[in-house]
Curated annotation (Swiss-Prot):
GO cellular component, one term: nucleus
Coiled coil: none
Biased composition (Low complexity): 28-38
Region (Disordered): 28-51, 162-195
GO biological process: mRNA transcription; post-embryonic plant morphogenesis
Tissue specificity statement from the Swiss-Prot or TrEMBL entry: Induced by NAC054/CUC1 and NAC098/CUC2 in shoot organ boundary cells.
Gene expressing this chain: LSH4
Residue ranges constituting the ALOG domain according to the UniProt record: 48-175
Native source species: Arabidopsis thaliana
Record protein name field: Protein LIGHT-DEPENDENT SHORT HYPOCOTYLS 4
TM helices/strands, residue ranges: none
Length: 195
């Protein structure tokens, strides 16, 4: 994760883009609790997921336009997606302890520390999932989807593992509880008394 710290000072974005992406990062890490002011649900209303996906897609499009030199979506690669994720990382709200911190590996540290705030792995993973879907919905083919690139998957795995160690929590998938096997059909009671 040290390569992220080095990236923070070297960004190609303008101040307005920084503010716009900071706002997008905030909406990515916090859940939207707003609902429609009209009491009923209309047929044209999008779900929270669809709205967030649209905002994320627009934010990434703005990132591409403000990139120096500007990038077209067709030229975007997994490396550009990683650059975007590393840039968003500085707007995170999750404390990730460094190896030198006395609270490294403690899920509930007893005191504050100077460790950096990062985007939580779950937020980054969800963001990439939404952008991956949006790319294909906007005409991109699954084979050329930069959000599904191997480098992006490896980066997310690295973030997950390093945050799990630093924060002392597990990101293991919860095992599904299997339903109990069906009981054999009940057989009718046979009466042994004569009629």
């Amino acid at each position: 994760m040290d390569h992220i710290i080095g990236f923070m000072g070297t960004t190609n974005m303008s101040h307005n883009t920084n503010l716009m992406i900071a706002a997008a990062a905030t909406t990515t890490t916090t859940s939207s609790s707003s609902s429609s002011s009209s009491g009923g649900s209309g047929t044209n209303q999008l779900s929270r997921y669809e709205n967030q996906k649209r905002r994320d897609w627009n934010t990434f499009g703005q990132y591409l336009r403000n990139h120096r030199p500007p990038l077209s979506l067709s030229r975007c690669s997994g490396a550009h997606v990683l650059e975007f994720l590393r840039y968003l990382d500085q707007f995170g709200k999750t404390k990730v302890h460094t190896h030198l911190c006395p609270f490294f590996g403690h899920p509930n540290p007893p005191a504050p520390c100077a460790c950096p705030l990062r985007q939580a792995w779950g937020s980054l993973d969800a963001l990439i999932g939404r952008l991956r879907a949006a790319f294909e919905e906007n005409g991109g083919s699954p084979e050329t989807n930069p959000f599904g690139a191997r480098a992006v998957r490896l980066y997310l795995r690295e973030v997950r593992d390093s945050q799990a160690k630093a924060r002392g929590i597990s990101y293991e998938k919860k095992k599904r509880k299997r339903p109990p096997p069906p009981l054999p059909p009940a057989q009718p009671a046979i009466s042994s008394s004569p009629n």
